Structure formats: C-alpha cells, structure tokens
UniProtKB/Swiss-Prot annotation:
The keyword Signal does not apply. NCBIfam families: mutl. Gene3D superfamilies: 3.30.230.10, Histidine kinase-like ATPase, C-terminal domain (3.30.565.10), MutL, C-terminal domain, dimerisation subdomain (3.30.1540.20), MutL, C-terminal domain, regulatory subdomain (3.30.1370.100). GO terms for molecular function: ATP binding; ATP hydrolysis activity; ATP-dependent DNA damage sensor activity; mismatched DNA binding. Pfam families: DNA_mis_repair, HATPase_c_3, MutL_C. This is DNA mismatch repair protein MutL. Belongs to the DNA mismatch repair MutL/HexB family. PANTHER family: DNA MISMATCH REPAIR PROTEIN MLH, PMS, MUTL, DNA MISMATCH REPAIR PROTEIN MLH1. It comes from Coxiella burnetii (strain RSA 493 / Nine Mile phase I). One of its GO terms (biological process) is mismatch repair. The keyword DNA damage applies.
Length: 574
C-alpha cells in the first residue's frame, strides 16, 4: 500500500479523539478556558447528557473579533508563544487544541464580547468550514454552544452511555473544578433544571461549605485541616481522619498548582501515609492542594492534562508521605482541631519508622506510670473523659463533657503497645539475627547496580549482605522479626523498588506488620477486668498516643455517644 497524506478533516477528527472522549471532556476544556479568561461566573446548560447540547456562558475577558477565526484553529493559543513558556505555565489551558478538537466533532457556535466593546461577534463552524464572524448582541464574556456531539463520527457516538451516566461525568468534572476555584461561581443546569449552584466562596467557612456540599457532611466532620511547607513545596487542604474511610477511592481529590490530576505516584504516596492506620480494603478521603514551582513539574504529558511528571518524583513522594503522616499523628482521640504548619526536618529514607522489638524485649505493661488518685476532675480536661465502669471485661465506659464514651480495651491497648514499640525501636535500633544457612542470590546487572548503590540502606534496614562474585550476593543476617523463608523474595522486591522508584518501603512495612502482630498478642484480651485506676491510665495513654483512635488493623478503638443522641433515643423532651 502507498503512503498518503490525510486530509485536514480526517486528521482533525482523529486528533479530537485524544481531547474529546465524551461530553464531560468538552465541559472540562471549555470551563478551563473560562477560568483562564478570569470569569467570575460560569453557567453550564446540558441537554440529554450533553449529546444534544452543551452550552457554556461566562463573564470573562472575551475574545477579540480578529482572533475568533484563529480561536477555532488547531495549535492557536494566547497562553504560550514558545516552548520555554511551558516552564512557567500557570493557566489551565495552553495547547491550543480544545476548540479545534470540539468543533471537528460537533456543530459549534462561539459568541464573545470584550469589556468596553460596543458589540459582540459570533462565529460558527458549519460542515467543517469556519464562517466569517458576524456582529451579535452579547454581554461581556463568551458563550460557546456545542450541539450534536459526534454527529459526524458515528463510531464514537455509539460508545456514549445513557444521558444520566454522561451527565454524572459532567457533574463530577464541575465539582472537581469548583474545588480548586473557590472564588468562581458555578451553575449547572440539566434539561432546563438547576442541579448545582456554587456561589463564590471568599472566606474559609465558605470554602469549607463548598467542600462539604461535594464531599459530604461526614467528611467535613472528620476532616483535619493541613498546611505543611518544606523545601519549596506546600501542601494544603483537608484529610479525613483514619477512622473515616471509603470502600472506593471516590473521595480523593489532589490538585497540583490548581490543576486536578490523576497521578499514580501521588496516589501511592498518600496511601502509604495512611498505611499504618488503614483497615484492609478501605480507602482514605482527602482534598489536597500541592503547590510546587512550575519549573519542577511537566504538565505537557497528555492532551487531557490529567497526568503530570515531576522532575524529582522521590522528593515529592517523601514530602507528601511526611506531611500527611505528621497530620494524622497529631490527631488525638477526642480532639478535633486544625493542624499547624510544620517545618520539621525529616529523613526520607528512614521515615517509614521500621519497628520490631529489640532483642530480648518482653511484653510491655499496661501502666507505665503510677496514675494520680481518681477524683471528680472537670471532665473537659480529658477528651476521653473519666472511667465509670467496665462491660463484660471488654469495653470501658467513660463520661466526658459530650456524653458517653465506649472504649474497646484490647484495641486501645494494642495501639498503645504498638506505638511504644515503634518509638523504642527508633531510639535503640534493629535487632539482627544470623542465618543458619546464608542465602545466595544471583542478580541481573540492574539489581547488582541497585544493591551496590544502596548498601548503606540495606544495612540500616537490618541486613548483612556481601558480594559473592560479579553477579551474586550472600545474605548472612536479617532483621530478627522477619521469617527467613521469605527473605529472597523480599530482597528482590526491594531491589525492584529501588530500580523503578529509587526508594522502598517494603522492609518497613514487613517489620511494622510483624510488630503489629506482636502488639496484638501482647495486648489485654477479653475478658480482663480492670480497676478504675487502670482504666483511667489506659484512657490517658490513648489521649497521648499517635493514632490512638484506631487499632493496628485500622479498626476504631472508641465511640462517642452524645447526650443529644441518648435523649433522642429515650424520647426525652418530646
């Protein structure tokens, strides 16, 4: 077959497939243009899930009449002029492809008027021909009317889902944009019915109300405010306490310089931060804003601009893990408060806090200090209140200023022991154990290089490894908490992490898992009856223990029952 050049119409329709996947893609691109044009109010009207009509009106800067034709051409943009401009890009759009791609697969009309202009102008794309702009009455700003999406590409149109499904995708797009542009007012109508109206939010309370309307009341009730800066990176936003988790990762919003992204590195880093407190199979919830020098992040990875590439991904990963871990650690049982900015130094390699028991360490006792004699102290001084009694040797009943607190004795003691063991390990170091039969491993060239580069890291992780020829190593000692039968796979997995990501957390996770198991077995088990003084000591330990609201497996350690809840149940005051 001969090579032939595609005509412009075919080439544009093929290229449009990268930008316009469904009606929601159109809404995203056009709203981003409105935001870049400094619009303070954006209205979106949808008919039949966007397949029939998408109409977006804004009060932004508008487009000069002489630029209207150029606006519908591919690779025409006002955002950048040369490749170097991408190093300092601050706008959401910059590729100059959106309008051209949309007009290639729809019937598009654009009307715009600039501030102080006597009239607006309208331009249409009919049968793939851009018409001459004509005068048209229009307020300041721009209106883009997109009708019959994919009318000329039947193969694409038949893959559209139901109008209800397509509309839900549109709604999610608007919610994502609304979460990063609080001062902009958003209105969404579907089939002439108002669905969303986010008013401009210029105060913290207004922004929190917008977040609550999107992520829900329960999220905000469990949310921790975070503001953390270090080494040129800043992370702001809200993370849910570890006790609030989801069965799906549907409440995870991460923005890089105001742009919503789906980035595996970022998602994995945030999940790693929750690793020590997350119940198996559950997902954390958060809305976070990462600010970074534009020169250190490449947003020109994919036409949809959902993906980014960091110049130093390890730097970003370590920062995110440390910031979120610090925030979660400062959340104490019974206390809800915003978290102050932290600038503490940290070691990104050792910050995973490997935590086995020291060699010869026995079970830690429940009460480390003699408690003060129990008195009727003012309740609010202690968030978990004061012990009243114990139920069947399992649950501790406590009273605080809100009402009744029920504590799972085993789960609470388990977390207390676990955190104390981790702290003790960090202070004293790892216990190592010699192998009866050293393990010989044959490595490929990449693995050999990774091991030679990270010998010191393996030593810190509790391994004694030596070279055994040009392509082999021999493992002689290992962390005492790890079983020898799994060491070969673990070391290979660690080397794979180092090759791919230049970092690893596998050993720390394995050690922490072993330590969590030890803490679980060492903790008080039901039925075990405590004195009031012992219950008091347990409550005070919980209040000062990191992640004291969750056991080592991510289950809650306590539950608050407010007086109002009890009054409602018993029909008091009715």
């Amino acid at each position: 077959m001969y090579i032939r050049r595609l005509n412009d119409q075919t080439a544009n329709q093929i290229a449009a497939g990268e930008v316009v996947e469904r009606p929601a893609s159109v809404v995203k691109e056009l709203i981003e243009n409105s935001i870049d044009a400094h619009a303070s109010c954006i209205r979106v009207d949808i008919l039949q899930g966007g397949a029939k009509q998408i109409r977006i009106q804004d009060d932004g800067d508008g487009i000069h009449p002489e630029d209207l034709v150029l606006a519908l051409e591919r690779h025409a943009t006002s955002k950048i002029a040369k490749i170097d401009d991408l190093q300092d890009i601050t706008t959401l759009g910059f590729r100059g492809e959106a309008l051209a791609s949309i007009s290639a697969v729809s019937r598009l009309t654009l009307t715009s008027r600039q501030k102080n202009a006597e009239m607006g102008y309208r331009i249409s794309n009919i049968s793939h021909k851009i018409m001459t702009p004509v005068p048209a009455a229009h307020p300041q700003g721009t209106t883009i009317d997109v009708q019959d999406l994919f009318y000329n590409t039947p193969a694409r149109r038949k893959f559209l889902r139901s109008p209800a499904t397509e509309f839900q995708h549109i709604r999610r797009i608007i919610e994502r944009l609304a979460l990063s542009h609080f001062t902009t007012e958003f209105l969404l109508h579907h089939n002439e019915k108002e669905i969303i109206h986010f008013k401009s939010a210029t105060t913290i309370s207004g922004q929190e109300n917008r977040i609550k309307s999107i992520l829900g009341d329960v999220f905000m009730q469990s949310a921790l405010a975070i503001e953390f800066s270090q080494s040129g990176l800043t992370l702001k936003g809200y993370i849910a306490e570890a006790a609030y988790t989801r069965s799906q990762p549907d409440l995870q919003y991460i923005y890089v310089n105001g742009r919503f992204v789906r980035d595996k590195l970022v998602a994995q880093a945030l999940r790693q931060a929750y690793h020590d407190v997350l119940f198996h199979g559950r997902h954390p919830a958060y809305v976070l804003y990462l600010e970074i020098d534009p020169a250190f992040v490449d947003i020109n990875v994919h036409p949809t601009k959902h993906e980014v590439r960091f110049r130093d991904p390890q730097w970003v990963r370590d920062f995110l893990i440390h910031a979120v871990k610090t925030a979660l650690a400062q959340a104490k049982p019974g206390i809800v408060h915003p978290l102050p900015q932290s600038t503490a130094e940290y070691n990104p390699i050792t910050n995973f806090a490997p935590t086995p028991l020291i060699e010869g360490q026995g079970n830690l006792s429940l009460i480390q200090e003699q408690p003060a004699p129990y008195t009727q102290t003012i309740v609010h001084k202690h968030p978990l209140g004061h012990a009243l009694a114990q139920l069947q040797g399992i649950y501790i009943l406590s009273q605080n200023e809100k009402g009744l607190v029920i504590v799972d004795m085993h789960a609470a003691h388990e977390r207390i022991l676990y955190e104390k063991m981790k702290k003790q390990l960090a202070e004293v170091g790892l216990a190592m154990q010699s192998l009866l039969v050293p393990i010989n491993l044959s490595l490929n060239p990449q693995e050999i290089t990774a091991w030679q580069t990270n010998k010191a890291l393996f030593a810190r992780l509790g391994f004694e490894i030596e070279s055994f020829g040009p392509d082999k190593i021999v493992v002689r000692r290992h962390p005492s908490l790890l079983k020898p039968k799994n060491l070969e796979n673990l070391i290979r997995d660690v080397l794979a992490d180092l090759i791919t990501h230049n970092t690893t957390s596998r050993v720390g996770e394995r050690i922490n898992a072993a330590l969590a198991t030890l803490a679980c077995h060492a903790a008080l088990r039901a039925p075990h009856y405590l004195t009031i003084e012992e219950m008091e000591a347990l409550l005070r330990e919980m209040e000062k223990t990191e992640h004291g609201g969750l056991c080592n497996h991510g289950r809650p350690t306590w539950k608050q029952f407010d007086i109002a809840e009890l009054d409602t149940f018993f029909l008091r005051g009715q």
